[in-house]
């Protein structure tokens, strides 16, 4: 594992790096001369735990291609950073305004902004007590290292999602194509870890998009009169795209919102074996009853949002 650490000026990057080296026995790689040398060394020693301080976007762009790389960014309140700055000899004669200007000059360089925004993990240091902050850092680093070094992944790349996370993310991506005024919903149908069909909610093909006035019921803001809605549900779209023959046996339907009752009936008829959903819906109980009576496995799953934000 190689962890690259970046952060705002005087946010505590050095403390985090020193902790990884001293407490968690990571090897510091900042003694290496150039990006190619760093990349070559890290690749040859990818089974070892290493850490490097990231200052240049060009270095990040090389390292982030490797599956064993994790980017951690650090940030802290301005008051904490000003206090740390005052302890340095270069800040002895500076006013508060001058210190803040120096911090801003570092933090708001375009390259630095892009660098920090590309992090996988973001530690927000909010604990003002130094001793409490240190213990919180140890606890949270321990937790995140356990997640990254999950033995169940069987040597898989650090940030590689599980199948459930992968397909639920695809369902969420499909939802971004929704044209419905009410809500965005996405769906993916999978068999043997292969995508059969995707779908999102909105008006049928050749009709005006819902957000352009294509469905009067949705644009009216009325939650009643569902029978007048012209929008297809995400599950319906995916099921129509797949068809019963392509669904076959042991297919799983991933949906970022629990299927409604009418979609549940169609899911049963199409032969889906399992339904995995992320968010609840007001008709959950009726849907569960239909699906479970048909012998369909139903479970809730939510993937970890990225970047992962951790309060210290």
UniProtKB/Swiss-Prot annotation:
Its EC number is 3.5.4.12. Zn(2+) binds at residues 233, 260, 263. GO terms for cellular component: cytoplasm. It comes from the Eukaryota. Keywords: Allosteric enzyme, Hydrolase, Metal-binding, Nucleotide biosynthesis, Zinc. Its cofactor is Zn(2+). Allosteric enzyme whose activity is greatly influenced by the end products of its metabolic pathway, dCTP and dTTP. It catalyses: dCMP + H2O + H(+) = dUMP + NH4(+). GO terms for molecular function: dCMP deaminase activity; zinc ion binding. It is an enzyme of class 3 (hydrolase). The active site is at residue 235. Residues 162-291 form the CMP/dCMP-type deaminase domain. One of its GO terms (biological process) is dUMP biosynthetic process. The keyword Transmembrane helix does not apply. Catalyzes the hydrolytic deamination of dCMP to yield dUMP, the nucleotide substrate for thymidylate synthetase. Present with 1510 molecules/cell in log phase SD medium. Belongs to the cytidine and deoxycytidylate deaminase family. This is Deoxycytidylate deaminase. It comes from Saccharomyces cerevisiae (strain ATCC 204508 / S288c) (Baker's yeast). The lineage of its organism: Eukaryota, Fungi, Dikarya, Ascomycota, Saccharomycotina.
